[in-house]
Amino acid sequence: MGMGERVSATGLCAALYAIGSFLTSYLVSPFGRGQFRPAVVLPAIFSIVYGPGVGGLGAAIGTVIADSMKHGSLYLPSLLAAAPGNFIGFYILGKLTRRDFNWRKFSIASQISLWIGCATVAYLYTIVISLLGMLPPSLTPEDLFMLGTSLTLWFFITEYPFVILLVPPILRALKFRGELKGGPSWLISLAIPGAIFLTISLMITFTPASSEILRGLIVKLNPSYALSTLQLIQLLFAGSGAAMTIVGLLLQVRGA
């Protein structure tokens, strides 16, 4: 693919991702930070079809545009945190799926790239907004680490199902390298990640140490709604984990 085509594809990716991200930008995590963003499907497709550079750069530009549109001016946390994380995540996805594209590779690559990308965004974002004075000064380094970890989990759990369920049929519709080689392993794709989230749900619900640490962070961030926020987080992990596990097992049995 020539330079002109790469530039055009990158611009299209950025524009579509910006529009898709802006449409859900007001749906945020229970912490009041971090957006619900199913639009990650778009740069994922561009990374696989046009290469890691196109998807990564398009995602970085698109997220800055979307966040800046929401806030009415250039949004520094997006430029300094979301852009690098988006670029790294989708660049890795494109790199890992460049050759011998198959279901197993796509599933594993999606999980690896999203975990790395989500963690990069979350921890950088936490550091940046703390330095900019956008968080309560009472937050300790441990609180900031917990917030970064919680946002990482939020990003992944609200983005991964869309990638794993929507990207393959879209690639088929685009006739990208023919059909995906091999059948989908829904155990690897959905059931195992779902079981992990169920485990996290049990930990933050029934383990006193974990629940108290999380409760302490929530009280500092939003004291008026601390209990309801904690319950919402527990429900999010339990519901998402159960749904992913059950759907993964059913699809695996059906395809067997």
Please give the residue ranges for each predicted region.
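Loop-helix junctions at membrane interfaces
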Residues: 1-256
